[in-house]
Amino acid sequence: MNQEKLAKLQAQVRIGGKGTARRKKKVVHRTATADDKKLQSSLKKLAVNNIAGIEEVNMIKDDGTVIHFNNPKVQASLSANTFAITGHAEAKPITEMLPGILSQLGADSLTSLRKLAEQFPRQVLDSKTPKPEDIDEEEDDVPDLVENFDEASKNEAN
């Protein structure tokens, strides 16, 4: 028998007795709330405790981006060595988070930050210095002096 046909037959569910029509398996679509409930029940099994008073959580990735949670819900189970952080997450570049994130950086992150700092002034200088072809000499705001105004005022006074 053909392997594809056999796999197709195995994937189908047979309801009823001999001679009944085969029908497809029902696909169960999971929602985010169902996943969240399942996650919370798993966390309850680990006996997690809520940690209050955490204003922000920053997770620094190797590529220089930061996953930033503002006012997250943090739960921890020290016996299982598990921390759960839930809330709205934003992916931001590390340069956007400076200087507030400096105290949170480790040694490896500081070396990557130094490399970023070396590249940053070059980019700023390159963008700020005007190119010679962009400078237009005819756009002087000061007009050329044509007459001598001192002589005109002396003539009016006489």
Curated annotation (Swiss-Prot):
Pfam (any one): NAC
Compositionally biased tracts (Acidic residues): 134-150
Modification type N6-methyllysine: residues: 5
UniProt cross-references to InterPro entries, sorted A to Z: BTF3 (IPR039370), NAC_A/B_dom_sf (IPR038187), Nas_poly-pep-assoc_cplx_dom (IPR002715)
Phosphoprotein as UniProt keyword: yes
Residue ranges of the region described as Disordered: 123-158
Name by which UniProt lists this protein: Transcription factor BTF3 homolog 4
